[in-house]
Swiss-Prot record:
Subcellular location per the Swiss-Prot or TrEMBL entry: Cellular thylakoid membrane
Protein name (record): Photosystem I P700 chlorophyll a apoprotein A1
UniProt gene name: psaA
Binding site for [4Fe-4S] cluster: C576, C585
Binding site for phylloquinone: W695
Assembly behavior: The PsaA/B heterodimer binds the P700 chlorophyll special pair and subsequent electron acceptors. PSI consists of a core antenna complex that captures photons, and an electron transfer chain that converts photonic excitation into a charge separation. The cyanobacterial PSI reaction center is composed of one copy each of PsaA,B,C,D,E,F,I,J,K,L,M and X, and forms trimeric complexes.
Binding positions (chlorophyll a'): H678
Keywords: 4Fe-4S, Chlorophyll, Chromophore, Electron transport, Iron, Iron-sulfur, Magnesium, Membrane, Metal-binding, Oxidoreductase, Photosynthesis, Photosystem I, Thylakoid, Transmembrane, Transmembrane helix, Transport
């Protein structure tokens, strides 16, 4: 950290332009108003594709960085408005169409539902029996559990929140318009990273955590404590009563009677009755202790608020981003000019900034997926198996898409924003200069992992086919135990009293300990890892490395390669390097993203299959009064998942029976979706396995027929370009694949869970 005399630093100011862009519905009503060529209107059918491709590509509208920044800033408000409308809709469904109050009274006996189908064509069959006389569609979003944890005790509160969401959406819409058309920030405001870091860390994250901790302490904790002890929701005081009536709170948490005295006299331990460090899960609800999570958010709030005072603005004290980056160099690891030049790259390229943020947020989403099942954060979510499976799958896929997006915007940065003159011998330049070594080594790793991990399965299938189980890799044959993972599990289970001396229990029974049963179902129990997990883990390693190889190659070779030295002149997406140069197709940055999407999907399919089967086999199930656990698939993972045939027969085929035989039941919609999504997936292959010329010839013969009948269109039909065809192909491939998996998973887990 440095302290500098204030006069040396440029002052942080909020500077805006007033009325920079007129509000003109007439202009916006004209399709393609943002592009001179598109505004002329369609000559061929390609126009509609270009309209969609370029509508949000602000770089193509203008080269003025300030205007691009304002458009992105304004679009963020629009995005937030959509999110608020979407959330409001979810809360409204909870208020109007759900059995939330019935579920709250009996969360282990009643299934959550927030949608009732109108029987127009006999779809009434889809309204399954949720218990308590309610018929509807079972939901798996985890919202009921979240609402319970928030302290929502009736549907009227959900109505109020839904209306609040719409008010916020309107506010966001107004803000988006206001900050583009009325008072638009100047470029210097967007580029002031120290002020941005301070406000985002202290404001968004710090005060965000603090307000959530405050809500948890003053509203969630007392309401959940009463619910856990069996008080009926309608008998619990309303949130404002807990806020303003100290004696009500003091009955539940005695330290409330002392007010703020312990805080100001530094006797913070007095508050340990509601800010706990118990560890483990609440045996009543199977979720994390809410007093632990309140403590956690309070601690995070303190950290982030402190972090929000780290960067130097108008007071001459604190860190400077540029100085930090330019000081990052050492001869051993970083080398050369280190991070010099990155400050300029990140303050002039939104693509560079976005690539980093997408990579981080995508990784975070994947980490969240894994934490949410191992340490269930909300009451009764652990025993709601369909919700656990859905949330894991959802966060994995979101993370995968965001990481591929990071590769996309990294490549766009290289093509559109990278300036070689400003990156001489810094880390970026040095990575690009030894890209051949990076990519060839990564390729070797992929080949090694692929052949060896797949080879283990081929070996096992062969020996099982030949009737030699003792020579297979399995827990009962040749063992390949995941010793490092088992060591980490053991480390976690031994932490209380050792490395975590104040914790009463380890973070979750999943690492070791006793079975935690809630309502006769397993909420969480130790997960034994064995040879089958070791093998599929290396398949994960293989597919993740291939995805990384494709995306990284796309970024590092986005500007040029030995094959096409002038790639940056061709742009981010181009089909081939012109006629007369064979073997130059599928080399653009865009094509790497296209291929990366398939491997991301491939990779995550195996992850969610592994999770689904492992949990059904070794964790989820029923618990008898004598403590006997019966798992859903009776622990068949360890022996079946070591062969390819086992995966096909005992997972895909055996568990697809629920969706395939769903006709005539409330799960029949999943049966229809399963078939329909297979169709969409197959439809994608028509775009992926065909040539443009074939379609152009076909179109021309159809146009000839139209001319004969004198009904020729004014807009000339054109076959999709190579890139357009690929975009349509990958979109339908992923949509079909994801919906197929969704239908397969939900029909299965709702039937058995």
């Amino acid at each position: 950290m440095t302290i500098s005399p204030p006069e040396r630093e440029a002052k942080v100011r909020v500077t805006v332009d007033t009325d920079p862009v007129p509000t003109s519905f007439e202009k916006w009503g004209k399709p393609g108003h943002f592009s001179r060529s598109l505004a002329r209107g369609p000559k061929t059918t390609t126009w509609i594709w270009n309209l969609h491709a370029d509508a949000h590509d602000f770089d193509s509208h203008t080269s003025d960085l300030e205007d691009v920044s304002r458009k992105i800033f304004s679009a963020h408000f629009g995005h937030l408005a959509i999110i608020f409308v979407w959330l409001s809709g979810a809360y409204f469904h909870g208020a109007k169409f759900s059995n939330y109050e019935a579920w709250l009274a009996d969360p282990t006996g009643i299934k959550p539902s927030a949608q009732v189908v109108w029987p127009v064509l006999g779809q009434g069959i889809l309204n399954g029996d949720m218990g308590g006389g309610f018929h509807g569609i079972q939901i798996t979003s985890g919202l009921f559990q979240l609402w319970r944890a928030s302290g929502i005790t009736n549907e009227y509160q959900l109505y109020c929140t839904a209306i609040g969401g719409l008010v916020m959406a309107a506010l966001m819409m107004f803000a988006g318009w206001f900050h583009y058309h009325k008072k638009a920030p100047k470029l210097e405001w967007f580029q002031n990273v120290e002020s941005m870091m301070n406000h985002h860390l202290a404001g968004l994250l710090g005060l965000g955590c603090l307000s959530w901790a405050g809500h948890q302490i003053h509203v969630s904790l007392p309401i959940n404590k009463l619910l856990d002890s069996g008080v009926a929701p309608e008998d619990i005081p309303l949130p404002h009563e807990f806020l303003f009536n100290k004696s009500l709170m003091a009955e539940l948490y005695p330290s409330f009677a002392k007010g703020l005295t312990p805080f100001f006299t530094l006797n913070w331990g007095e508050y340990a009755d509601f800010l706990t460090f118990k560890g483990g899960l609440n045996p009543v609800t199977g979720g994390l202790w809410l007093s632990d999570t309140a403590h956690h958010h309070l601690a995070l709030a303190v950290l982030f608020i402190v972090a929000g005072h780290m960067y130097r603005t108008n007071w001459g004290i604190g860190h400077s981003m540029k100085e930090i980056l330019e000081a990052h160099k050492d001869p051993l690891i970083i080398g050369g000019e280190g991070h010099k030049g990155l400050y300029e790259a990140l303050t002039t390229s939104w693509h560079a900034q976005l690539a980093i943020n997408l990579a981080m947020l995508g990784s975070l989403s994947i980490i969240v997926a894994h934490h949410m099942y191992a340490m269930p954060p909300y009451p009764y979510i652990a025993t709601d198996y369909p919700t656990q499976l859905s949330l894991f799958t959802h966060h994995m896929w979101i993370g995968g898409f965001l990481i591929v997006g990071a590769g996309a915007h990294g490549a766009i940065f290289m093509v559109r924003d990278y300036d070689p003159a400003k990156n001489v011998n810094n880390v970026l330049d040095r990575v690009i200069r030894h890209r051949d070594a990076i990519i060839s080594h990564l390729n070797w790793v992929c080949i090694f992992l692929g052949f060896h991990s797949f080879g283990l399965y081929v070996h096992n299938d062969t020996l099982r086919a030949l009737g030699r189980p003792q020579d297979m890799f399995s827990d009962t044959g040749i063992q390949l135990q995941p010793i490092f993972a088992q060591w980490v599990q053991n480390l976690h289970s031994l932490a209380p009293g050792n490395t975590a001396p104040n914790a009463l229990a380890s973070v979750s029974p999943i690492f070791g300990g006793d079975v935690l049963a809630v309502g006769g179902k397993v909420a969480m129990m130790p997960m034994t890892l064995g040879t089958a997990d070791f093998m599929v883990h290396h398949i994960h390693a293989f597919t993740i490395h291939v995805t990384a190889l494709i995306l990284l190659k796309g970024v590092l070779y986005a500007r040029n390669s030995r094959l096409i030295p002038d790639k940056s002149e061709l742009g981010f997406r181009f089909p081939c390097d012109g006629p007369g140069r064979g073997g130059t197709c599928q080399v653009s940055g865009w094509d790497h993203v296209f291929l990366g999407l398939f491997w991301m999907y491939n990779s995550l399919s195996i992850v969610i299959f592994h999770f689904s089967w492992k949990m059904q086999s070794d964790v989820w199930g029923t618990v008898d009064p004598d403590g006997t656990v019966s798992h859903i698939t009776y622990g068949n993972f360890a022996q079946s998942a070591v062969t390819i045939n086992g995966w096909l027969r005992d997972f895909l085929w055996a568990q697809a029976s629920n969706v395939i035989t769903s006709y005539g039941s409330e799960l029949s919609a999943y049966g229809l979706l399963f078939l329909g999504a297979h169709f969409i997936w197959a439809f994608s292959l028509m775009f992926l396995f065909s040539g443009r010329g074939y379609w152009q010839e076909l179109i021309e013969s159809i146009v000839w027929a139209h001319n004969k009948l004198k009904v020729a269109p004014a807009i000339q039909p054109r076959a999709l370009s190579i890139t357009q065809g690929r975009a349509v192909g990958v979109a339908h491939y992923l949509l079909g694949g994801i919906v197929t998996t969704w239908a397969f998973f939900l029909a299965r887990i709702i039937a058995v869970g």
